[in-house]
C-alpha cells in the first residue's frame, strides 16, 4: 500500500511539474498560448496584463455584460494599464490591446498583419468580403479598382448632391424651429440618401425600403452586441442552436434585399450607357463606385457577389459612420456657443447661395475643419480596429502567438495626454497648423492609417462639412443633451444608450 501511495504521490508531483512548465508557455485554464517578450524579460516589463475576475483568465469577465458594460470594461482596463498597452487572455487566444500611437504605427504599417480579428467574423454575413474584411490579392485588386472612384474630380461631382441633400435637411429643421430634435432619427436619413445617390448613383427617395433598411441595420447591431457579450455566441453552431437565428436571418434578407435592389436598378442604367469609353481628351473616364464595379465586372475583374459585398460595405461605411460623426459634431457645437460663433463668422465670407460655394472654398474653412477633427478625435465612429496574427509574430518587443488577437484602441490613442493635452476637453484649435507641429503622425487616426486606411475619408469629411456649413449659417444650435448624461456603448460603431437632442433656432439675417 505504501508503495502504491508513493507511486501516486510521485505521479501527481510529476504531473504538477509538467503542468507548471506548460503553464509558462500556455495559459492552461484559459486554453490559450501566452504572449512572451522577444528578449526574454518578464512580460510585465513591456505590457500590462489585466487580471481576470476568475482563474480562467478574462474569459468570464465579459459574460452577459451589456454593450455599455463592455465599453466601461475597456475604459477600466485602459485606466489600470496607466498608459501601457495591455493583454487580455481569452479562450484559445490572447488579445493584445494597443493604446499608444507609437506602437499602433507598427501594426498600421505592417503588410503582414492585415487579417481582421474575430469580431469582424460576426459582421462577415452582412458585409461579405468587401474592402473592410477582405485580405491579400482580393483586397489589393479591389482597392486598386475602387481608388479612382474617390478621385478629386469625382468628389467634386458629388458636391452638388451634398448641397441638394443639405437643402432638404434645412427644410426639415425649418419646420421644427424651437423644438428639441433627436439627431439619431433625422441624421441617418440624410447620410443614407447621400451615399446612395453619390457613390451608388440611385436616388433613395424613390425607394420605399429606405426606412426598413435603416431599421434592419439597427436590429443587426443589436444581435451583434448580443453575440459580443457572450463568448460562446462567437461560434456559429452555438448561435444557430441557442441564439435568435431566425430573426438574424430575416434581418440579413432585408439588408441584402435592399442593396440587391439598388444594384439591379443601377445595372439597368449601366446597360444604357457606354461606360469605359474615353473622353474628348483621350483619357479613360472615371466613374462613381457602383459604376466602377459594374465596369470591372464587364472586364471580368469582379463577379456579382463581389459587387454585392462592396456595395454592402460602402453603404454601411458611408451611412452609419458618417451619421455618428455628424451627431456628435452637432452636439459639440451646441454645447460650445463660442466655437459655433467662430464657425459662423468664418462662413460669412462664402457666397450666400450654397450652390455657388466651390470645393476650394469648402476646403478653406479652417475652423470648421478643426471642429470636425476634434469631434472625430473625441468620438471616433470606429473606436476599435482589430487584427489577427495568422502566424507567430514579433511586434513592439512582444512575441504574439498564432491566432493572437490585436485591438488598436483608436478611442484611447486619440485621448493620450502626451499628444493631446487636456484630452477630454473639446479644443478645436489644437488642430490649427501651428498647434499640430511635431505631433506623432499616428496620434490622430479616426480613419485608421497605413495601406488599409478608409478609402472614403475625404468623401465623408466633405459630406459632413457641407451639411454643417448649411446648418450653422441658418440656425443657432442649443443643447438639449449634456455629455455627462450619455451612456456610451460598445458596438460596430460608437453608440449612446440615449438619443442625442439639439434645439435649432433660426438665425436673424
UniProtKB/Swiss-Prot annotation:
The keyword Oxidoreductase applies. The gene is Cyp4ac3. Pfam families: p450. Its main location: endoplasmic reticulum. One of its GO terms (molecular function) is monooxygenase activity. Its cofactor is heme. It is a peripheral membrane protein. Belongs to the cytochrome P450 family. GO terms for cellular component: endoplasmic reticulum membrane. The keyword Metal-binding applies. Keywords: Endoplasmic reticulum, Heme, Iron, Membrane, Metal-binding, Microsome, Monooxygenase, Oxidoreductase. Its EC number is 1.14.-.-. Coiled coil: none annotated. May be involved in the metabolism of insect hormones and in the breakdown of synthetic insecticides. PANTHER family: CYTOCHROME P450 4P1-RELATED, CYTOCHROME P450 FAMILY 4. It is found in: Endoplasmic reticulum membrane; Microsome membrane. Heme binds at residue 454. This is Probable cytochrome P450 4ac3.
Amino acid at each position: 500500500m505504501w508503495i502504491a501511495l508513493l507511486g501516486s504521490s510521485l505521479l501527481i508531483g510529476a504531473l504538477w511539474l509538467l503542468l507548471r512548465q506548460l503553464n509558462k508557455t500556455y495559459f492552461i485554464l484559459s486554453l490559450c498560448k501566452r504572449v512572451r517578450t522577444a528578449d526574454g524579460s518578464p512580460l510585465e516589463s513591456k505590457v500590462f496584463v489585466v487580471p481576470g475576475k476568475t482563474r480562467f483568465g478574462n474569459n468570464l469577465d465579459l459574460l452577459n455584460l451589456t454593450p455599455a458594460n463592455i465599453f466601461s470594461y475597456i475604459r477600466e482596463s485602459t485606466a489600470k494599464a496607466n498608459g501601457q498597452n495591455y493583454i487580455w487572455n481569452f479562450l484559445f487566444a490572447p488579445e493584445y490591446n494597443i493604446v499608444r500611437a507609437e506602437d499602433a504605427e507598427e501594426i498600421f504599417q505592417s503588410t503582414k498583419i492585415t487579417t481582421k480579428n474575430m469580431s469582424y467574423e460576426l459582421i462577415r454575413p452582412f458585409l461579405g468580403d468587401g474592402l473592410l474584411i477582405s485580405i491579400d490579392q482580393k483586397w489589393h485588386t479591389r482597392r486598386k479598382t475602387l481608388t479612382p472612384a474617390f478621385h478629386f474630380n469625382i468628389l467634386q461631382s458629388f458636391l452638388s448632391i451634398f448641397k441638394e441633400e443639405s437643402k432638404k435637411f434645412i427644410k426639415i429643421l425649418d419646420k421644427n424651429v424651437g423644438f428639441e430634435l433627436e439627431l439619431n432619427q433625422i441624421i441617418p436619413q440624410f447620410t443614407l440618401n447621400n451615399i446612395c445617390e453619390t457613390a451608388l448613383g440611385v436616388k433613395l427617395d424613390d425607394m420605399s425600403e429606405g426606412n426598413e433598411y435603416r431599421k434592419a441595420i439597427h436590429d443587426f447591431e443589436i444581435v451583434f452586441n448580443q453575440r459580443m457579450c457572450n463568448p460562446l455566441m462567437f461560434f456559429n453552431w452555438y448561435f444557430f442552436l441557442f441564439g435568435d437565428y431566425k430573426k438574424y436571418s430575416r434581418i440579413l434578407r432585408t439588408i441584402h434585399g435592399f442593396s440587391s435592389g439598388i444594384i439591379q436598378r443601377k445595372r439597368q442604367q449601366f446597360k444604357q450607357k457606354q461606360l469605359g469609353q474615353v473622353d474628348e481628351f483621350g483619357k479613360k473616364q472615371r466613374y462613381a463606385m457602383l459604376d466602377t464595379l459594374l465596369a470591372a465586372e464587364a472586364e471580368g475583374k469582379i463577379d456579382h457577389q463581389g459587387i454585392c459585398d462592396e456595395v454592402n460595405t460602402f453603404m454601411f461605411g458611408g451611412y452609419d459612420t458618417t451619421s455618428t460623426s455628424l451627431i456628435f459634431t452637432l452636439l459639440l457645437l451646441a454645447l460650445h456657443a463660442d466655437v459655433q460663433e467662430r464657425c459662423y463668422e468664418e462662413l460669412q465670407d462664402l457666397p450666400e447661395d450654397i450652390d455657388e460655394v466651390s470645393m476650394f472654398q469648402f476646403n478653406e474653412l479652417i475652423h470648421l475643419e478643426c471642429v470636425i477633427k476634434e469631434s472625430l478625435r473625441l468620438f471616433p465612429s470606429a473606436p476599435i480596429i482589430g487584427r489577427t496574427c495568422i502566424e507567430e509574430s514579433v511586434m513592439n518587443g512582444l512575441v504574439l502567438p498564432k491566432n493572437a488577437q490585436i485591438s488598436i484602441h483608436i478611442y484611447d490613442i486619440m485621448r493620450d495626454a502626451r499628444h493631446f493635452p487636456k484630452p477630454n476637453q473639446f479644443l478645436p484649435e489644437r488642430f490649427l497648423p501651428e498647434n499640430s507641429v511635431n505631433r506623432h503622425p499616428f496620434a490622430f487616426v479616426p480613419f485608421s492609417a497605413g495601406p488599409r486606411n478608409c478609402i472614403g475619408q475625404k468623401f465623408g469629411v466633405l459630406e459632413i462639412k457641407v451639411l454643417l456649413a448649411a446648418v450653422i449659417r441658418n440656425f443657432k444650435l442649443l443643447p438639449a443633451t449634456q455629455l455627462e448624461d450619455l451612456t456610451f456603448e460598445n458596438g460596430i460603431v460608437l453608440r449612446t444608450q440615449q438619443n442625442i437632442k439639439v434645439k435649432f433656432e433660426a438665425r436673424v439675417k
